[in-house]
C-alpha cells in the first residue's frame, strides 16, 4: 500500500479554489452557505 494523497498546491487551488467556486452558481451557493455559517476560510 502507498499513500493515496499526494498534495499539490496548484491542483488543490484549481479544484477547490475561490475562483473555481465563483465560476458556477452552485459554487456561489457553497460560498454563501459558508459565509452564513461564519467560516474563517471560505475556500482551499
Curated annotation (Swiss-Prot):
Domain of life assignment: Bacteria
Cellular component GO terms held in the UniProt record: ribonucleoprotein complex; ribosome
Region (Disordered): 1-44
Biological processes, Gene Ontology terms: translation
A GO term, aspect molecular function: structural constituent of ribosome
PROSITE patterns named in the record: RIBOSOMAL_L34
Ribosomal protein among keywords: yes
Extent of Basic residues compositional bias: 7-22, 31-44
Record keywords, A-Z: Ribonucleoprotein, Ribosomal protein
PANTHER family (UniProt xref): LARGE RIBOSOMAL SUBUNIT PROTEIN BL34M, MITOCHONDRIAL RIBOSOMAL PROTEIN 34 FAMILY MEMBER
Family note: Belongs to the bacterial ribosomal protein bL34 family.
Protein name from the UniProt record: Large ribosomal subunit protein bL34
